[in-house]
């Protein structure tokens, strides 16, 4: 599958998307550039599909990609939040878990911005 380079090496691009997916899971809505949001969408949807499966192998696959960050006041991390809170919401839904909303251009460089959030 073709992907945008976003002006980064492949390792930096992977690190960027790991951070963005983790932030999306924790906050459930993030603001980023339109191109990053479009590239992030299939990755985030894959994580939700794995979380819906719910088995140990799926949990390990998600944990290998998502950063280990505290997601809430109880000290639960992002992987736990994805499996316990977000995935059950989409139990009856087959794909289309995220939505991209266009925002105005960024101040400074006028880059087109967008919000990506869970439906």
UniProtKB/Swiss-Prot annotation:
Transmembrane segments: none annotated. PROSITE patterns: RIBOSOMAL_L17. InterPro entries: Ribosomal_bL17 (IPR000456), Ribosomal_bL17_CS (IPR047859), Ribosomal_bL17_sf (IPR036373). One of its GO terms (molecular function) is structural constituent of ribosome. One of its GO terms (cellular component) is cytosolic large ribosomal subunit. Keywords: Ribonucleoprotein, Ribosomal protein. One of its GO terms (biological process) is translation. The keyword Cytoplasm does not apply. Coiled coil: none annotated. The keyword Calcium does not apply. Part of the 50S ribosomal subunit. Contacts protein L32. PANTHER family: LARGE RIBOSOMAL SUBUNIT PROTEIN BL17M, RIBOSOMAL PROTEIN L17. Belongs to the bacterial ribosomal protein bL17 family. This is Large ribosomal subunit protein bL17.
């Amino acid at each position: 599958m073709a992907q945008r380079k976003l002006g980064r090496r492949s390792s930096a691009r992977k690190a960027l998307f790991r951070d963005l997916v983790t932030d999306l899971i924790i906050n459930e809505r993030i603001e980023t550039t339109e191109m990053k949001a479009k590239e992030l969408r299939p990755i985030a949807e894959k994580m939700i599909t794995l979380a819906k499966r719910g088995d140990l192998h799926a949990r390990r696959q998600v944990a290998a990609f998502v950063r280990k960050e505290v997601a809430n006041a109880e000290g639960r991390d992002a992987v736990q939040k994805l499996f316990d809170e977000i995935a059950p919401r989409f139990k009856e839904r087959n794909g289309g878990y995220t939505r991209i909303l266009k925002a105005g251009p960024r101040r400074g460089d006028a880059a087109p911005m967008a919000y990506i959030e869970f439906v």
